[in-house]
Regions:
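C-terminal interaction appendages of subunits in large macromolecular complexes
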Residues: 1-168
Length: 168
């Protein structure tokens, strides 16, 4: 008692339908899975870098909260406040500590590895140790609710930043 049946093993390879044997079909499938995993990983890395960048800005705001509140209060419109936040260089011990962590093997991690793609070099931590806010960070700070200014929230931001950097 033996049953046989035919299979039409056609696959789209480079946009063209092609009849494949089992070996070719498995090879094409594995190549497809590698591409999918690579694209997903790059997407998640980009997303984690963007979130880390926003968290750095929030940490700067929490470290210099009095200056931020004064600038926002004295500005006539949100775009003026945003421009003022972006033009100043900010000193922040907290962000310096967040950016200067060491790897498990003892080497120092390069902060540029965590920069979002397309972010100009003028933003972020400068050679002088001062931090310049980007457009995205300034916008996020202006949209931040006052309840996020508490000490407990600062600990949450630092903890989330560490989690994001561990993912990267």
């Amino acid at each position: 008692l033996q049953d046989t049946f035919g299979m039409n093993m056609v696959a789209l390879i480079d946009g063209q339908p092609r009849l494949c044997n089992l070996k070719d079909l498995i090879s094409v499938f594995l190549q497809h899975r590698r591409e999918v995993v690579t694209r997903r990983t790059v997407f998640e890395l980009r997303k984690a870098r963007d979130r880390g960048h926003v968290l750095e800005g929030l940490a700067i705001a929490l470290g210099n909260i009095d200056d931020f509140i004064r600038i926002i209060r004295e500005s006539p419109t949100p775009p003026v406040a945003k421009a003022e936040l972006m033009t100043r260089s900010w000193d922040s011990k907290l962000v310096r500590e967040m950016l200067t962590r060491t790897r498990a093997d003892g080497g120092v991690i390069n902060a540029d590895d965590y920069r979002p793609e397309g972010l100009e070099k003028e933003f972020g931590m400068g050679q002088d140790g001062l931090y310049r806010l980007s457009d995205t960070q300034a916008q996020e700070i202006l949209q931040m609710r006052l309840q996020r200014l508490t000490g407990l929230e600062q600990d949450k931001i630092v903890a989330e930043y560490k989690e994001v950097m561990a993912v990267i």
